[in-house]
């Protein structure tokens, strides 16, 4: 990361993160680089989605507790719970993150738009 900063990087972004503690640990390890670290936020949409990310995508961990929350969920119920999990992540990292990198799952842009509205509401609370 330091090499990227030396070559002009103005921010860094992560893969989707589902554990706030992991992001905060990464932030602590990279905090002296002088650029914002933006966590990837991709709402889960189903149990299958959570399991796939956890088991098949290197570098992405979906904690046991979150996989348990997604158990048996799909379609609208899965998307609702995935948004709730994403909001909780944003709440837990809001004061530390340099912003967020929102990733709409499967082209479901409406989920990212809901998170944008949520983030803007959080920002207004601080004013």
Language-model regions: role of each:
Residues 32-89, 106, 120-127:
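Active-site pocket-lining/capping segments in soluble small-molecule metabolic enzymes
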Residues 10-19, 101-104:
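Catalytic beta/alpha-barrel core
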Residues 1, 23, 82, 86, ...:
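Aromatic/hydrophobic pocket-lining residues that form the small-molecule binding cavity
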Residues 4, 8, 39, 100:
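Conserved, mostly hydrophobic/aromatic
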Residues 94, 113-124:
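A short, amphipathic alpha-helical segment
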Residues 16-32, 107-118:
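Active-site-adjacent beta->alpha loops and helix N-cap segments on the catalytic face
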Residues 7, 88-99:
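A structural motif corresponding to the C-terminal end of an alpha-helix
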């Amino acid at each position: 990361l330091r090499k990227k900063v030396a070559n002009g990087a103005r921010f860094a972004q992560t893969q989707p993160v589902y554990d706030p503690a992991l992001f905060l640990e990464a932030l602590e390890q990279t905090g002296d680089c002088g650029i914002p670290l933006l966590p990837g936020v991709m709402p889960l949409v189903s149990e299958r989605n959570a399991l796939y990310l956890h088991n098949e995508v290197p570098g992405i961990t979906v904690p046991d507790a979150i996989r348990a929350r997604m158990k048996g969920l799909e379609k609208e119920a899965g998307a609702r719970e995935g948004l709730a999990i994403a909001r909780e992540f944003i709440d837990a990292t809001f004061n530390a993150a340099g912003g967020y990198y929102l990733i709409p799952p499967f082209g479901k842009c409406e989920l990212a738009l809901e998170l944008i509205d949520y983030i803007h509401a959080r920002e207004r609370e601080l004013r």
